[in-house]
C-alpha cells in the first residue's frame, strides 16, 4: 500500500495525502461511511458515490460473519462483488462488537467465546478466525483482532488487555503470512493501539504497534465515554509515536468538530455511525451548527435544507418539509437527513484537505469548530 503525503500544515500536525489500494485511491483526510452489514443504512450505492462522494466504506466482520455468512460471501467472490461496490472497503475485526456483548462472551488467551445477538448460537473468535473471515470478506483494509477495554478500566485490567491485544496482533500477522489473499487483490492489515486512558500504556502500545511496520495504524478504545479533552490528549500522544509515513486511523470518531480537531493532531482516517444514526433521529449537521429538525421552530421554515451544499437533497427539500416527514414518521425523512449528513461529513474532510494544501487549515478549523458545534 502506497501512502503519499502531499502537504503538511505549518501550524498543526494536519496533513493531506493519498492512499492507494487495488480498488482505487483514497484522498486524506477521509471519512468512511459505515456500512455494517454491507449497506450504509438508507443510502443507495449510486448516491454514496455520486452525491456523497464516498471513496471508501466500512463493513463489520462480526455482522457479516453472522449474516450473510462467509460461505455466501465466498460464492459471491467477496463482499465487493456481493454488494456490487467497486471502491475500497475497510472491515473492522469484530472485536469491538464481540466485547460489547458483555453478558454473553468470555475472553481467554485463545480468543472470545460469545453468543450471537441474533439467535443465541455459540461462536468463537480468535485472531486467526478473525483474519480467516476477513480474507473471505475480501476488504482492502483489514483490522487486527483486539480487545477494546471498557471505560473506565482499572490500570491492571487495561495493562493486561493491552498485552493481550499485542499477542493477538502477532497471531494475526502470522496467519496472514501463511494464508494469502483469496480474490486476487491485496489486503492490508492495520493493527490497533490500545491502553485505555493511561498515558504510559498508550505510549507502550503505540511503540509496539509502530514496530510491526504494517501498512497503516489505527487508534482504538477512544470516544467510548471518556472526556473529549482526554481523547484529544491520547490521540496526540499516540500520533507523536506512530510513523509519519503511514496512514493513521482513529476508530469511531466522531462529531464534525471532533474530526477537525483530530485532523489537526495528525489523523488521516475516520469512521462513525453518528451521521446516519443521528440523522435517523432528526439531527442535522451543518457548517453553521446543529439542527434538530423535530423542533417546532422549523415548522414554517421553507428555506432549503442546506443551500451551501450542492447535493440533490440539499437543493431540493425545505426544512419545513423534512420536519413534516419526521413528524409523520415517513421513511423518506431519515433517508434525506442520512444523505445530507454524509454529504456534509465528506464535504468537511475534503474542505480540510484543501485548507491544508493552501496553508489556511488552522485558522479555518478554529472558526469551523466553534460554528459547527452551535445548536441552532
What residue spans do the PLM features occupy?
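Short, solvent-exposed loop/turn segments at secondary-structure junctions
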Residues: 33, 63-64, 96-97, 149-150, ...
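Non-catalytic, usually N-terminal nucleic-acid engagement modules in DNA/RNA processing proteins
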Residues: 1-182, 296-299
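Alpha-helical packing segments of well-folded alpha/beta enzyme cores
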Residues: 130, 161, 165-168, 172, ...
